[in-house]
């Protein structure tokens, strides 16, 4: 068999040989700078050049420095500050440096603008406001001359906020007018400077409203004053009232667009110009109307005078708010409300002034009802003498008194005992004459304190009492009783079968009221509800002081009010109360039920005893449990199913472990054990001992 040729086979081209191209070491090659790259570099430098002083830019050749005599040759469109090329305006006489001079503060001193051929030298302060795009604070007497002299400047798109530029065909270039022509601008309409180009067409024409001749100051002096004035940050435009007062002070008369004196110069159609917004400033909110009764004293005064409205000087009537309800409130309710809300010290408003829903006034911080305009007298309004009698007769509820105290500026006079503040809870309802015939006659009764010492359901009783006092339930459930902490006069019918009572009882007692007494409303309170402050509501809810006071007063009142009754009537009433109480007590949940529902807490001793019992049961169970060894023996647990866990102390595993080394005592014990094993290993039965090698004869 011939041996294989020893020459190795020719090397084939590797499958991945092309990868070498990608993994070559990197070589830096110098790139030729392209024209587009150079152009973008110039644009970027021009953008950055906004932050550099002018001489440096001229040195680097980024700005063409046109000499001042070279007025006649305007360059083509100069580049704007943000590097874009400008839209061509044929008639705008500007040089390329002119804009730079506009947008940057002039570092090399003042030079006159190339677009102007005015003989007067313009002071630096006059040019500066235009260059900084700041709105110089023009005092009311100083007309803004320089704003109108300057020709319209194109503003870069970055500075003009969201304003849409108008098409070029609309823009009429403003020819520079000599300063002698410029009429002083009226102080109300001094516009803050924005670029004239982006103003609405109606505003491009300068405002040329003339003042009386006494006001016109010589123009040279004005420009000098303007130059002296320091640059200030722009102030917010004053609100309408202040501007009105200024006008009346300056001109001796109020300038309205309708009543302005005509002058020789043509006046554009009268219009109100909102002061245009400076490009750097955020938009100023429109001035607020001044008669929002922001002065509470003014509001109080106008309330007291009831009709002679005193509003601040520059106030306009405020827009009417939508009425609170779709249906107008009843006139009786309105009169009641007026009666309740009027401070006691003020004279009562005559009946002809008590109007139906008054025109809503603007929201005031302290809700003071605006004085109502006089209206022809209403037929439904009761005569004032009756109203006054009514007021003096019924005690004023406490929450209404608080309302009055909050509303009136003067301290309220102290009332006599009949007018003492009283909670609505204890006001009795009179039954109308129509109902008296149909319904059973009710008897007021003083109930002594019927409170079980271990009573847990006060809430039920309180809710029961509420239902007895609310007007609708007094008709539907005539059998309600008040049982609670406060003894008071309660309405109980003189004779009614108890079965009817019990049916009623089942209908409406709710256990959910845990808030204390919920007070009912009178009919005229519905309208009053919106007006009441939170403090009054709080007092209305929890008027405990009034409850106590009425509780004290009740016994004396009851002596006078209650007629003498026969023994049978008293027994009947007591029987009714007794049946009600029995029924209530029979319905009470037992202590066990309450404990189950976690309402009643158990006694501490009982709780501990229960704990002990549980512990004892558990230990007994544990003691009877089989051990692990037993379970393993009985093959219930396999050896790997139970792992004993012991507590091991943490120790350093690399350190010396002395417990692993055997002490001499350990060794002796081990040896002894081994010897014992050996000695017993060969133990044999006596009968077979002779078979062994080691035996004594």
Curated annotation (Swiss-Prot):
Q: Where are the RPEL repeats?
A: 42-67, 579-604, 616-641
Protein location? Cytoplasm; Cell projection, Lamellipodium
Q: Give me the disulphide-bonded residues.
A: none
* Gene Ontology BP annotations: actin cytoskeleton organization; closure of optic fissure; enteric nervous system development; negative regulation of integrin-mediated signaling pathway; neural crest cell migration; neural tube closure; positive regulation of catalytic activity; regulation of cell cycle
Per UniProt, the keywords (alphabetical) are: Actin-binding, Cell projection, Cytoplasm, Developmental protein, Neurogenesis, Repeat
Major localization class? cytoplasm
Q: Where is the composition biased (Pro residues)?
A: 317-326, 370-380
Q: Does the keyword Repeat apply?
A: yes
Disordered: annotated span? 63-381, 450-569
> Can you provide one Gene Ontology molecular function annotated for this UniProt record?
protein phosphatase activator activity
| InterPro entries according to UniProt | RPEL_repeat
**Amino acid composition bias (Basic and acidic residues), ranges on this chain:** 189-202
Comp. bias intervals (Acidic residues): 454-469, 501-514, 522-532
Assembly? Binds ppp1ca and actin.
Name-wise, this protein is Phosphatase and actin regulator 4-B
Originating species: Xenopus laevis (African clawed frog)
Give the lineage.
Eukaryota, Metazoa, Chordata, Craniata, Vertebrata
Chain's gene name: phactr4-b
């Amino acid at each position: 068999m011939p041996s294989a040729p020893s020459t190795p086979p020719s090397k084939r081209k590797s499958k991945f040989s092309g990868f070498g191209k990608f993994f070559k070491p990197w070589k830096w090659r110098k790139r030729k700078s392209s024209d587009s790259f150079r152009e973008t570099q110039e644009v970027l430098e021009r953008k950055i050049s906004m932050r550099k002083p002018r001489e440096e830019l001229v040195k680097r050749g980024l700005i063409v420095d046109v000499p001042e005599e070279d007025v006649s040759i305007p360059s083509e469109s100069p580049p704007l500050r943000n590097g874009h090329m400008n839209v061509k305006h044929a008639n705008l006489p500007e040089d390329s440096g002119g804009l730079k001079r506009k947008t940057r503060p002039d570092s090399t001193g003042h030079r006159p603008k190339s677009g102007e051929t005015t003989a007067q030298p313009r002071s630096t302060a006059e040019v500066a406001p235009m260059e900084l795009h700041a709105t110089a604070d023009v005092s009311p007497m100083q007309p803004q001359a320089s704003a109108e002299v300057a020709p319209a400047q194109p503003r870069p798109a970055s500075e003009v906020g969201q304003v849409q530029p108008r098409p070029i065909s609309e823009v009429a270039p403003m020819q520079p007018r000599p300063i002698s022509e410029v009429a002083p601008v009226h102080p109300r309409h001094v516009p803050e400077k924005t670029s004239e180009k982006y103003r609405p067409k109606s505003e491009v024409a300068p405002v040329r409203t003339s003042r009386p001749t006494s006001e016109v100051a010589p123009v040279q002096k004005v420009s000098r004053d303007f130059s002296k004035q320091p640059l200030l940050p722009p102030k917010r435009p004053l609100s309408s009232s202040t501007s009105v007062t200024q006008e009346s002070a300056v001109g001796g008369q109020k300038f309205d667009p309708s009543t302005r004196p005509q002058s020789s110069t043509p006046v554009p159609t009268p219009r109100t110009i909102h002061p245009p917004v400076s490009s750097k400033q955020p938009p100023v909110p429109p001035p607020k109307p001044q008669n929002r009764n922001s002065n509470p004293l003014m509001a109080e005064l106008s309330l007291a005078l009831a009709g002679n409205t005193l509003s601040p000087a520059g106030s306009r009537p405020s827009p009417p708010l939508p009425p609170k309800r779709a249906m107008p409130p009843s006139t009786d309710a309105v009169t009641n409300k007026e009666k309740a809300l009027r401070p006691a010290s003020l004279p009562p408003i005559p009946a002809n002034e008590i109007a139906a829903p008054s025109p809503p006034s603007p929201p005031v911080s302290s809700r003071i009802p605006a004085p109502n305009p006089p209206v022809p007298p209403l037929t439904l309004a009761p005569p004032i003498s009756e109203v006054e009698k009514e007021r003096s007769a019924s005690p004023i509820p406490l929450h209404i008194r608080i309302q009055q105290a909050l509303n009136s500026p003067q301290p309220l006079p102290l009332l006599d005992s009949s007018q003492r503040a009283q909670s609505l809870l204890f006001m009795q309802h009179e039954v109308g004459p129509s109902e008296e015939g149909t319904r059973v006659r009710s008897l007021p009764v003083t109930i002594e304190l019927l409170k079980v010492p271990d009573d847990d359901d006060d809430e039920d009783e309180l809710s029961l009492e509420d239902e007895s006092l609310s007007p609708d339930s007094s008709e539907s459930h005539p059998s309600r009783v008040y049982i609670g902490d406060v003894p008071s006069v309660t309405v109980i019918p003189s004779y009614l079968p108890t079965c009817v009572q019990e049916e009623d009882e089942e209908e409406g007692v709710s256990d959910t009221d845990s808030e204390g007494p919920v007070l009912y409303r009178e009919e005229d309170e519905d309208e009053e509800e919106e007006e009441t402050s939170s403090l009054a509501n709080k007092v209305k809810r929890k008027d405990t002081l009034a409850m106590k006071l009425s509780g004290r007063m009740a016994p004396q009142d009851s002596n006078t009010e209650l007629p003498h009754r026969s023994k049978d009537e008293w027994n009947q009433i007591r029987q009714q109360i007794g049946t009600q109480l029995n029924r209530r007590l029979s319905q009470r949940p037992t202590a066990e039920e309450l404990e189950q529902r976690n309402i009643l807490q158990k006694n501490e001793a009982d709780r501990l005893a229960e704990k002990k019992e549980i512990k004892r049961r558990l230990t007994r169970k544990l003691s009877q449990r089989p051990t692990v060894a037993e379970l393993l023996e009985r093959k219930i647990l396999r050896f790997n199913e139970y792992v004993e866990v012991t507590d091991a102390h943490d120790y350093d595993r690399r350190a010396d472990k002395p417990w692993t080394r055997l002490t001499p005592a350990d060794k002796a014990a081990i040896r002894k054990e081994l010897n014992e094993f050996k000695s017993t290993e060969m133990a044999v039965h006596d009968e077979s001992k002779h078979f062994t090698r080691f035996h004594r004869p």
